[in-house]
Amino acid sequence: VFRYAETLLNYVEAINELREPYTLEMPNGSQVTVEHNTADIVKYFNLIRHRAGLPGITEAVAADRNKVRELIKHERRIEFACEGRRYHDLRRWGDAMEAYNRPISGCNVKARSNERQKFYTTTILNDKLTRRSFSYKHYFYPIPKSVLDKNKNLVQNPEWR
């Protein structure tokens, strides 16, 4: 199941990253050309923002690819919070090593009930249970041995050998 917001954000991200027009041949034989288009970026990004009662972006903002990329990353983080998409987003953007190799900060979940104020103090969580790591090899999944055995031309992904 794809949410409408995910479809819109995927489209905005794709057209923001296009460097040159791309033509697709459709099953009925017609062709559709997609290109970097700031008007579409504004239109579809703002559909998400406006339905939440938030201000949209302007054509001037949409003209800056890097700014739009950062806005998309931020919007996806909020729109899909607790939906399990963040890990794959970070991998796709190449941001996972930076994000997962730093300590987690947040509420002090170890504060006792009589230390209510300590709960709201931002704390670095750096114990065995909260420590995370991400290395280059995690950008790729290992190819199962059964698949490698069936096709001798396949080579295991880097660092999974």
Regions found by a protein language model. Give the residues of each.
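Long, intrinsically disordered, low-complexity segments
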Residues: 1, 49, 59-161
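C-terminal substrate/ligand-recognition segments
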Residues: 1-44
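Structured segments of extracytoplasmic/periplasmic soluble domains
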Residues: 11-18, 44-55, 71, 75-79
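A generic structural signal for short coil/turn motifs at secondary-structure boundaries
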Residues: 23, 56-58
